[in-house]
UniProtKB/Swiss-Prot annotation:
It holds the Pfam family ComC. The lineage of its organism: Bacteria, Bacillati, Bacillota, Bacilli, Lactobacillales. It comes from Streptococcus oralis. This is Competence-stimulating peptide. Acts as a pheromone, induces cells to develop competence for genetic transformation. It is found in: Secreted. InterPro entries: Bacteriocin_signal_seq, Competence_ComC. GO terms for biological process: establishment of competence for transformation.
């Protein structure tokens, strides 16, 4: 059930990131995204 809560919180974060990208703060949102989803090659 905790996964459902995390998804709800993630949706809110995603919407906030989209607004930041529109504002031109794409560097900050990219850093947050990297922290949430570390790139593994």
């Amino acid at each position: 059930m905790k996964n459902t809560v995390k998804l709800e919180q993630f949706k809110e974060v995603t919407e906030a990131e989209l607004q930041e990208i529109r504002g031109g703060d794409w560097r900050i949102s990219e850093t947050i995204r990297n922290l949430i989803f570390p790139r593994r090659k």
